[in-house]
């Protein structure tokens, strides 16, 4: 039976009961968990993609001009990403992780804030990659961004020193294949949990938006925490339409 929390307090109390009763909790996070940390949303009105049209993967690979523009945009955002620190939502999930309730987090975010909050790298399933380092699109060789920046300042967007294919941020661009291993791990986790908490996601980007449904079909209870309604509110057991930091803040340190 779906419950839309009438106020923040009742929502937090019900969420606390569900967390206490759960054995295995899988959080699924979207952009909303990071906006209080200063990371701008990409998709919402006024977001980055409304100001700069996304560069698709095939365009990046085919055009030096597109690669230069992609890296110019990334370095223009460097201060924002470098200054960001985990918010209350990240820290609350890390507390549940340390307590053994959360085996891993599934995220659509690329900002590395779950790792910064205390999650081991191998326990953060990044569906859309990570913008804090770079990877060759050919052989997969990884590079630190300071190396890319030095090359970029000298000669524009660099190619791989191993195979001479283009180097891009280790994120998933439009038209690029989703990471198979991460999708498989996210599927297994969604099917194995007894509480799935979707946080700060509009739940419209597929295939990632399928994980809450998958967990629900497998018998898990579903919580959705998002300021705006989502298309999956009707199947949720609890919907909390309040600030994420305020909602999850009471669970920091528990």
UniProtKB/Swiss-Prot annotation:
GO cellular component: cytoplasm
The protein's required cofactors: Zn(2+)
Lineage, top ranks: Bacteria, Pseudomonadati, Pseudomonadota, Alphaproteobacteria, Hyphomicrobiales
UniProtKB keywords: Cytoplasm, Metal-binding, NAD, Transferase, Zinc
PROSITE patterns reported in the protein's UniProt record: SIRTUIN
Transmembrane feature ranges: none
Annotated binding of nicotinamide, by residue: 42, 110-111
Domain of life: Bacteria
EC number(s) per entry: 2.3.1.286
InterPro entries associated with the record: DHS-like_NAD/FAD-binding_dom, NAD-dep_sirtuin_deacylases, Sirtuin, Sirtuin_class_U, Ssirtuin_cat_dom
Catalytic activity: N(6)-acetyl-L-lysyl-[protein] + NAD(+) + H2O = 2''-O-acetyl-ADP-D-ribose + nicotinamide + L-lysyl-[protein]
Residues in coiled coil: none
Residues given in the record as Zn(2+) binding sites: 136, 139, 160, 163
Cofactor note: Binds 1 zinc ion per subunit.
PANTHER family: NAD-DEPENDENT PROTEIN DEACYLASE, NAD-DEPENDENT PROTEIN DEACYLASE SIRTUIN-5, MITOCHONDRIAL-RELATED
Positions annotated as active site in the UniProt record: 128
Species: Bradyrhizobium diazoefficiens (strain JCM 10833 / BCRC 13528 / IAM 13628 / NBRC 14792 / USDA 110)
Family of the protein in this entry: Belongs to the sirtuin family. Class U subfamily.
Cellular compartment(s): Cytoplasm
GO molecular function, one term: NAD+ binding
Function: NAD-dependent protein deacetylase which modulates the activities of several enzymes which are inactive in their acetylated form.
Residues bound to NAD(+): 31, 35, 42-43, 108, 110-111, 128, 201-202, 226, 243-244
EC primary class: transferase
Protein name: NAD-dependent protein deacetylase 1
The UniProt record lists the keyword Phosphoprotein: no
């Amino acid at each position: 039976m779906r419950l839309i929390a009438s106020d923040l307090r009742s929502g937090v109390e019900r969420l606390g009961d569900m967390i206490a009763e759960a054995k295995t909790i899988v959080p699924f996070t979207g952009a909303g968990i990071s906006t209080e940390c200063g990371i701008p949303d990409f998709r919402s009105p006024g977001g980055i993609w409304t100001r700069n049209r996304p560069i698709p993967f095939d365009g990046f690979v085919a055009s030096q001009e597109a690669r230069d523009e992609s890296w110019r945009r990334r370095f223009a955002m460097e201060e924002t990403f470098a200054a960001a620190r985990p918010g209350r939502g990240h820290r609350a999930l890390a507390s549940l992780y340390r307590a053994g309730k959360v085996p891993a987090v599934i995220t659509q975010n690329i900002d590395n804030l779950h790792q910064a909050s205390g999650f081991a790298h191998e326990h953060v399933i990044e569906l859309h990659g990570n913008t804090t380092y770079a990877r060759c699109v050919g052989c997969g060789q990884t590079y630190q961004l300071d190396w890319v920046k030095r090359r970029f300042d000298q000669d524009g967007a660099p190619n791989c020193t191993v195979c001479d294919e283009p180097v891009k941020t280790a994120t998933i661009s439009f038209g690029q294949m989703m990471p198979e291993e991460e999708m498989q791990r996210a599927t297994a986790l969604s099917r194995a949990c007894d509480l799935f908490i979707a946080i700060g996601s509009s739940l419209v980007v597929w295939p990632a938006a399928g994980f809450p449904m998958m967990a629900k079909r497998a018998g898990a209870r579903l919580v959705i925490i998002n300021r705006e309604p989502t298309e999956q509110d009707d199947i949720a057991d609890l919907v909390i339409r309040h600030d994420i930091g305020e909602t999850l803040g009471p669970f920091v340190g528990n």
